[in-house]
Amino acid sequence: MRIAVVSSYPPRHCGIGTYARARSARLRAEGHTVTVISPPDGDGDVRVPFVNGREFREAARRGASFDRIIVHFQPGLHYRPGATAALSKIRTSLGLRALVRRRPQTVILVHEALPSKWWRPDHVILRRAFAHARLLFHTRLEHEAFERDYRMRVPAELVDHREGVHVDGIRDQDAARRHLGLDPSEPLLVCAGFLQPSKGFDRAVRAFAASEGPGRLVIVGSVRVATPDNIDHAAELRELAAATSGVTLLEGFHSDEDFDAWVSAADRLILPYTRAWSSGALARAQLLGTPAIVAAVGGLVEQVGPEDEVIRSDDQLRRAIQRIRSGERIGPRD
């Protein structure tokens, strides 16, 4: 099958781009021919600016050559932020609607879709695009939330988030700790991902501060989109980590190998998100064999595995951290 993929792509520092690369590699391994349409800062086969819907028009123009067109959808990938970009947003939505109408083989993998704002023309057009496309989601709860937000019934298929995750780094906990120069026996908790308020890493720091015992909490991540909210949040997190004994913030982009090494080295990966649809970090942890402490938001509850722990409050998060610091081991890290 000949497949076009529309997505951000490495070397851009973007989790969805990394996901798209892994999923494209899987498709190629299955014998499909894959052509990636990426922004200029990605290593796609075709590179166009993701502005004003140009990526969708390019896919539509080339569409006759493909049996399937897969669009990786997350608003931040395709829409310029801010009120001054209103016309650009309309053009982007028009581009996507034109693509799905002209090329019915288009599939939209929805990583995230912000709640619909009915008064905005770009959202009206976007809703029409979704209505004509075949949609994919990672969890049933994401699909249901999408239907509530957009007030529409749409058939959809679910895809395992792990299909877009490839790990080839260190999986053994002891080896990962040696690689990172860490104490082999000290309790280690890790938060990993982009620094933004919805990740809730500040919740983990406060819960760690409220617990007792040996151990470290390491936050590994960087700001992906330099919005004022994200920049302010990173600054606050920096101050909070510096003021909390046992907490380290390793700010900056990390290679897949080092990212996976930190996850493998951890006794628990902590995902204290305040808003999420699904989590690539959780999928990576599951493939690496690291249990996670996961907030009950969005589709995460549906994504958790048998060794993961779901928390529904800050106090439950504190108690989960306390158990690890007290030496209690649950699951495969015994």
Regions found by a protein language model. Name each.
Residues 130-171:
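Donor nucleotide-sugar binding/catalytic pocket of nucleotide-sugar-dependent glycosyltransferases
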Residues 90-102, 118-135, 237:
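Membrane-proximal helix-turn-helix segments that form the acceptor-binding/catalytic region
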Residues 216-235, 252:
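Glycosyltransferase donor-sugar binding loop
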Residues 261-277, 290:
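Acidic donor-binding loop of glycosyltransferase active sites
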Residues 169-182, 235:
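A short helix/loop element that forms part of the nucleotide-sugar donor recognition site in Leloir-type
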Residues 231-260:
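Nucleotide-activated donor-binding/catalytic signature segment of Leloir-type glycosyltransferases, i.e.
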Residues 306-316, 323-328:
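Conserved acidic donor-binding segment of nucleotide-sugar-dependent glycosyltransferases
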Residues 182-199, 205-208, 217-220:
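Conserved donor-binding/catalytic core segment of Leloir-type glycosyltransferases
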